[in-house]
Amino acid sequence: MIQVLLVTLCLAVFPYQGSSIILESGNVNDYEVVYPRKVTVLPKGAVQPKYEDAMQYEFKVNGEPVVLHLEKNKQLFSKDYSETHYSPDGREITTYPLVEDHCYYHGRIENDADSTASISACNGLKGHFKLQGEMYLIDPLKLPDSEAHAVFKYENVEKEDEAPKMCGVTQNWESYEPIKKASQLNLTPEQQAYLDAKKYVEFVVVLDHGMYTKYKDNLDKIKTRIFEIVNTMNEMFIPLNIRVALICLEIWSDKDKFNMTSAANVTSISFRNWRATDLLKRKSHDNAQLLTVIDFDGPTIGKAYMASMCDPKRSVGIIQDHSTINLMMAVTMAHEMGHNLGMDHDEKYCTCGAKSCVMAKALSRQPSKLFSNCSQEDYRKYLIKRRPKCILNEPNGTDIVSPPVCGNELLEVGEECDCGSPTNCQNPCCDAATCKLTPGSQCADGVCCDQCRFTRAGTECRQAKDDCDMADLCTGQSAECPTDRFQRNGHPCLNDNGYCYNRTCPTLKNQCIYFFGPNAAVAKDSCFKGNQKSNNHTYCRKENGKKIPCAPQDIKCGRLYCFRNLPGKKNICSVIYTPTDEDIGMVLPGTKCEDGKVCSNGHCVDVNIAYKSTTGFSQI
């Protein structure tokens, strides 16, 4: 018989009703003081770690006993998690802190099947829990020698302002290309296997200089807040079979890395470009979000690129630090990542079992951590059509923070498979007790694994997503689909309206639609002649800092000119020009400028010359 030692850290539970108090979460008008009692079951003689893998707290809410069960979120960080900040002279400082024994938990309330919890146990209990359909927040009261905490409903937090808070995304990623509901599609076994596979988003959070100064240069305070927010984000995506793992936190402690502006669209483009040219070269990741103190124009508090997960330029979001309540920030960040994963804004008919769902266009004063049925359908549809590969990349066994454990459904060092506990495992290819393949099995999971055997060579495992993609085939030697292949640069696309360039099909029309909306069109040639003038914003390229006007044959490779086609208004030659980032609004490299020609370094050149190299083709 195993002897256990019950360790009780606080024996008393004294409820107390308060009228008003100021906490980190804001001004609270009605709260209850509780003294949580922690009960930990340990084998006799066992050493108690600083933060146990599982904990249990008891306290009362509205006079009724509550038992809070917590489990450490072992998937919050990757082993190679890093933190980057900058010295006053701009020197990059990157550290790799030990994060295994962290203090961030998910949980539930005993005897409440609909309950959830996201809690930081670093210094008392801080976070939120859902009890009997109501969202409660809990904050430690900073009293000397006291275990007192305040518990209060979210609705009792004094609202910071009454202005609406909205997402800046306006375009449905399939506005012009409707398809059937994902549930109605006839899926191939490979598509179904892809849908069923666990997904992992390797996530980077970047804080601008304003965030650093807002928290009075206190790096520890900033980190704690971000960890609490991402812990909640992680919990929100679990029902979608996604793990959000924080792999890097970057803090611009010296200065902003580009000029910040209140125009969300411009800041989004600037952050996108900085990530592609700087951050990705230093830290491989799937998705990044910028948190800023900038008050975006209008009601906008966030913006992201639709259906862009894994895209080296577009898998980003920008977030305004609009609330002191971590739950509100987590919902906003999850909302923008939802856009990256193909989710549109909810319509009136969308439901999630709460008053508002994550993908509502306006942030509700009663936020929910649930994605609607529409969001889940959008996500499935996006996965089926786009199949973003990076989110299939499970963290390497050596990258997982916790020690290898057979039965946790994570493939770790020394394991051939891991289908969960023997009770829950339903995979006939995997021995749940040993995490080894069953006799005769070649594989247990993967899009090229069928009934425990490698799929026949030549079987399609990844459909072509568009004209510049190529279908990928199983090799017959692996359960995984080979590396994604793409059409060579210069391959015709979009009905010969463009040429493939670095996996995309850039056209003048699509660039006009991006900047000016779905009614926009390419302007007349007479507008583009403005690029022949030598002024501040019309030119073809820069040489040694000098702006070079376009030659007559190159005018469609300089500044982009569009017609907005606004109802009741005369079309004028419209351009986008931002002094803080002059590249915004220029025609993209690889864009078709004439039949058989593309833009290359501000010149309109023959497509075969632009992409020719010793191997036949190269990038511009």
Swiss-Prot record:
Domain Peptidase M12B, chain residue ranges per copy: 199-395
Pfam families in the record: ADAM_CR (PF08516), Disintegrin (PF00200), Pep_M12B_propep (PF01562), Reprolysin (PF01421)
UniProt: Ca(2+) 1 binding residues: E202, D286, C390, N393
Binding site for Zn(2+): H335, H339, H345
Top-level EC class as recorded in UniProt: hydrolase
Organ and tissue specificity: Expressed by the venom gland.
Motif (D/ECD-tripeptide): 467-469
Active site: E336
Cofactor(s), names only, from the UniProt record: Zn(2+)
EC number: 3.4.24.-
Cofactor info, note text: Binds 1 zinc ion per subunit.
Subcellular location: Secreted
Sugar-bearing residue positions: N259, N265, N373, N396, N502, N536
Binding-site residues for Ca(2+) 2, renumbered to this chain: V405, N408, L410, E412, E415, D418
Alphabetic keyword roster: Blood coagulation cascade activating toxin, Calcium, Cell adhesion impairing toxin, Disulfide bond, Glycoprotein, Hemostasis impairing toxin, Hydrolase, Metal-binding, Metalloprotease, Platelet aggregation inhibiting toxin, Protease, Prothrombin activator, Secreted, Signal, Toxin, Zinc, Zymogen
Entry's Gene Ontology BP terms: proteolysis
Subunit structure: Monomer.
Annotated family: Belongs to the venom metalloproteinase (M12B) family. P-III subfamily. P-IIIa sub-subfamily.
Protein name per UniProt: Zinc metalloproteinase-disintegrin-like ACLD
Organism expressing this protein natively: Agkistrodon contortrix laticinctus
